[in-house]
């Protein structure tokens, strides 16, 4: 972000995300910390995924809190909460174990795998001013 390298470790114990800068000498310095709440749903964070889209850097955090959160990096390394997707009956995002992000045709496609529910979650993220997400659920048959 703006030529600066950042590291975002998650603490499952404290339910927080911490943003650290990494300078050329390898020294880490704290920049920001975000605590989980019912509005963010990354308690016990186990999975983080980062990506860039149209010049912006993003982080997705998921844990054992039945959902995931999308954050954008500000120019000074602060995490700006954009959206949270909470688990519902038709979205297998409880206890997410893996996240995959791909940019297809300019759209951000987010795929999730749950450790406790069948299926693959598929979300199309709209990173416009509304920063909302649309969800689809894809189910795979067990072939052996």
Residue ranges and their predicted role:
Residues 1-144:
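Feature marking well-ordered beta-strand scaffolds used for ligand recognition
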